[in-house]
Regions:
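Surface-exposed beta-strand/loop patches in extracellular or lumenal glycoproteins
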Residues: 43-61, 142, 151-155, 424, ...
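Beta-strand-rich binding/interaction modules
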Residues: 63-70, 438-439, 449-538
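Long, ordered, helix-rich scaffold segments
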Residues: 463-466, 505-506, 524-858
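N-terminal, polar/Ser/Thr-rich
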Residues: 1-39, 47, 65, 117-124, ...
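A surface-exposed beta-strand-loop module
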Residues: 55, 60-118, 139, 519-531
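Extended, low-hydrophobicity, Ser/Thr/Pro/Gly-biased non-transmembrane segments
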Residues: 17, 102-204, 227, 370, ...
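Hydrophobic alpha-helical and helix-loop surface patches within well-folded domains
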Residues: 178, 208-209, 213-482, 617, ...
């Protein structure tokens, strides 16, 4: 039985048979305040290529009342099964189907999500349909290449606003009748409804006027910095329309900040939904504003790449996400007046770290993954699909040229507007504009898995001049269990030479760009080139590879990493050091010392915050267990020293306060947290606002210094959805058997928690200082996880499978327990992948711990 799955072969056959014309969808949401179910009436008109053919339409609904095909009533009990409605005896040419059903509101962030704000006790609704969840709201042919027009008619409670892909009409008797959309895929249709707060503006250029809207719940309205959001949006419109040479393809552009959102945002055509944590209630660093801007630009880029032109099947999901990721960073880097021209530093520091991690898991896969069915795609929103793909697009731009790249993209949009494509369509357009044959490039980069390592091999003469510089390329074996073979790839890279100037700064003195092919590539050198202090391969981060430094360069970088005048080479060196730590080539204790020696000079706040996270992870997971507490003590003392030394009111001060709160451990340190929380002690310039208070509360709760009553009192100060999440995490973090048992039961033994609260409880439950307390839950996890996977929706089950895996129990016993479960449980491919990825993390941590222990005895 197919259940809720859909195979590629089924989708191909349905696309061969059908051409879908239009949907008319009538939804009665008048009872949304109470919840439960709602009436959904779908009328869909489509053509069949054959007379008498048979197919199906998708629907996930508690009850189906009527199914009528070409005027004939079908027996519901016979045709509705396994989330499908069987459609037999189709006419050649035009057909019309009408389905009347009761669909369910959800609390999982899939389908039509319903949330009640504790501040005003009003219900707020929004849809999330990618990948296969439009069928939870209306009967649909749920695949991206069966595009159609969509006309929504919605009955809603009085006083509500309803937003969809088309411009919002004036309601008549609380009924909102929208105009049909252009031809789009089911997964980018949308409906958002509730008493939302709205701010409106326009984007205007050369006679073009695009209405803009920003929405959030009224309880967040005081924090909504609409002017900043509109400014980023207009920057995106300006840059994308110029680079794509195609006007914005929809009638308006709304951005809706919605609660309990599982992802960062979703590119619904003209009605983008964004997690409302991006409406900042408290002070955040500029890095948070940069991430929000990147999210806004990412979704806006999708209006062209993904919505206007859409992949035929989910194996090209990477192209959607990689292009939007590349475009978001490029816009921030190159748009006139951008606030974040250093965005490629952020990309190297965060997105590529994600990609490198993902690419070294047993689940590594080619960028163009083999997506056999919906189960495959649901676990494929990963670091390869987004970050590696975007890195490779950046490499492609370096390979064909920026102007040639965008000229090809322009031709691609014009040729395929409102249609569906495959990768070959884009590559063909780029081949025409660049003159490059991209077939071999595509095979090496898009159809193989794994990551290359680039090392310099340097020879000098007695006078200190370079006599040769060779780039040595390696293709390490793929992780155990991964499919494919190691592959050497063509790389377009820059080699940077850096020297110390008279003021002790590392400045670039030369840059050589070249194509790297095969195992060894000689770098052409100017005559009499002195050996530079640092030779940096992949300078400017043009390619996707792990980079290693030669011994002399590593020695200089270890002493002067913070002295690079530019942020990108610093980020590349930081990334290399982190990668070496994860690989066991650099001991955790040495990585800690490297960070402590250079972080004070790091001006990029995003890099600083990444280093905070990486050091904490390294000492928690990669340090030899007998040294771990000493390492944590050294790190915590450093965080407090930097907090006290930071400029009052600065981003760095806030970042160090959060780093200190994440790891405070001694009685004196915890007393300081308590005093800062109570206001009996202050640090000049540090505003202990709502979100920082919760960071302190969670650490104090995890340390056993706040009880249930005190957590409840903090929640009374912040009776909001965010406060509810923080309180749930704090309760689960308490170091008692009772707290852990209650948290476990609420997530694993009950399915009542909404997605966001479940996520919070899981994050509170898994405290790295509580390994012994959590040890009994290893056995409980393996006893429960398959049943959870089978019973819950994908999002909820994935949270549990990943979040509650015993990753903190770094031991051979955990590996053995995992292997035994994989052998006996016979999980489906998606669950097997998630558990295998977590197992790989434990295996890596064991190797890193051994390397750290060996360094101590060396």
């Amino acid at each position: 039985m197919p259940g809720t799955n859909l195979t590629r072969e089924e989708a191909q056959e349905r696309a061969r048979l059908l051409t879908v014309d239009a949907y008319e969808i009538d939804l009665d949401l008048s009872g949304a305040q109470e919840g439960g179910t709602y009436r959904s009436v779908t009328t869909v008109r489509f053509d069949s290529a054959e007379d008498g053919a048979e197919t199906f339409i998708d629907l996930v609904a508690p009850a189906v009342h009527d199914v009528e095909l070409n005027g004939k009533a079908l027996d519901v009990a016979s045709v509705f099964r396994d989330s499908r409605i069987a459609l037999k005896h189709l006419r050649a040419g035009a057909n019309e189907l009408k389905v009347v059903a009761d669909c369910a509101y959800t609390n999982t962030g899939e389908g039509l999500h319903r949330f009640v704000d504790p501040v005003d006790e009003q219900a707020y609704l929004y849809t999330q349909f990618e990948v296969p969840d439009a069928r939870r709201v209306f009967a649909s042919f749920e695949q991206p290449d069966l595009k159609a027009t969509f006309r929504f008619t919605v009955k809603a409670p009085a006083g509500w606003t309803v937003i969809s892909n088309s411009p919002t009409p004036e309601p008549v008797d609380d009924v909102w009748s929208f105009e049909p959309t252009p031809r789009i895929s089911t997964y980018i249709t949308a409906l958002i409804a509730g008493p939302y707060h709205a701010v409106h503006s326009t984007y205007e250029k050369d006679g073009q006027v695009v209405p803009l809207g920003i929405y959030c719940r009224p309880s967040l309205a005081e924090y909504l910095d609409a002017d900043d959001i509109f400014a980023v949006t207009r920057q995106g419109f300006e840059w994308f329309q110029e680079k794509f040479d195609y006007p914005y393809p929809f009638a308006k552009y709304d951005q809706l900040f919605v609660p309990e959102f599982n992802a960062g945002a979703m590119e619904n055509a003209g009605a983008v939904t964004i997690r409302d944590q991006y409406v900042f209630r408290s002070k955040v660093t500029d890095a948070s504003y940069e991430v929000r801007a990147a999210t806004i630009l990412h979704e806006l880029a999708h209006m062209w790449f993904g919505d206007l032109v859409t992949m035929e099947w989910w194996n090209d999901l990477w192209l959607n996400e990689s292009f939007a990721t590349f475009a978001e960073v490029a816009c921030q880097a190159y748009a006139e007046g951008s606030r974040w021209p250093h965005s490629w530093t952020t990309f190297a520091n965060s997105m590529k770290t994600w990609a490198y991690r993902q690419d070294q898991l047993p689940s590594t896969h080619p960028i163009m993954a083999d997506i056999r069915d919906l189960d495959d795609v649901l676990v494929n929103f990963d670091g390869i699909t987004y970050a590696k793909g975007a890195s490779v697009l950046k490499q492609l731009v370096a390979y064909v040229g920026m102007d040639e790249f965008f000229t090809g993209v322009q031709a691609y949009f014009k040729a395929h507007a409102y249609g569906n494509t495959r990768l070959a369509d884009l590559l063909g357009a780029l081949e025409k504009t660049s003159g490059r044959d991209l077939k071999a490039w595509s095979k090496a980069w898009l159809e193989t898995a794994g990551i290359n390592v680039l090392r310099p091999e340097i020879e000098t003469d007695g006078a200190g001049h370079l006599t040769s510089l060779t780039v040595v390329q390696e293709a390490p074996a793929l992780p155990a269990g991964a499919k494919g073979e190691p592959t050497l790839r063509p790389h377009r890279i820059a080699v940077g030479f850096y020297d110390l100037d008279g003021e002790g700064h590392l400045v670039r003195t030369n840059r050589i760009e070249l194509d790297v092919e095969g195992e060894r590539t000689a770098v052409p050198l100017p005559a009499d080139t002195a050996r530079p202090a640092v030779v940096l391969l992949n300078d400017d981060d043009l390619s996707y590879a792990k980079v290693r430094l030669d011994e002399d360069s590593l020695r200089v970088v270890t002493e002067h990493l913070g002295d690079f005048t530019e942020s990108l080479p610093r980020a590349l060196c930081w990334a290399s050091a982190w990668d070496m730590t994860r690989d066991g080539e650099l001991a955790t204790r040495d990585y800690l010392e490297l960070v402590l020696s250079g972080i004070a000079k790091e001006s990029d706040i995003g890099v600083v915050q990444s280093l905070h996270r990486q050091v904490k992870l390294a000492v928690d997971q990669y340090a030899a267990p007998e040294w771990r507490e000493a390492g944590l003590t050294r790190w915590t003392e450093a965080t407090l020293a930097h907090l006290r030394a930071a400029e009052p009111g600065s981003d760095h001060q806030l970042a160090w306060a959060r780093a200190f709160a994440a790891t405070a451990r001694t009685p004196l340190q915890l007393d300081l947290l308590q005093a800062l929380l109570n206001g009996t002690e202050e640090i000049e310039g540090l505003a202990v606002d709502t979100e920082l208070r919760w960071a302190f509360v969670q650490r104090l709760a995890a340390s056993g210094l706040l009880d249930e009553e005190e957590i409840a009192a903090e929640y009374e100060r912040d009776r909001t959805a965010a406060g509810e999440r923080h309180a749930a995490a704090a309760r689960a973090a308490q170091p008692s058997e009772a707290a852990k048992a209650e948290a476990w039961a609420s997530v694993v033994e009950s399915d009542k928690l909404p997605n966001s609260l479940q996520e919070s409880v899981i994050s509170g439950f898994t405290q790295s200082d509580q390994r012994e307390l959590l040890a009994p839950y290893t056995e409980k996890f393996f006893a429960a996880v398959k049943d959870v996977w089978d019973a819950r929706s994908h999002e909820m089950a994935q949270q549990i499978a990943v979040g509650l895996y015993p990753a903190l129990q770094v031991s051979q016993a955990t590996l053995d327990a995992t292997d035994a479960w994989l052998e006996s449980a016979r999980p489906n491919a998606a669950l097997r992948r998630l558990i295998s990825e977590s197992r790989s993390g434990v295996e890596r941590a064991l190797r890193a711990q051994a390397a750290d222990a060996a360094a101590a005895s060396a």
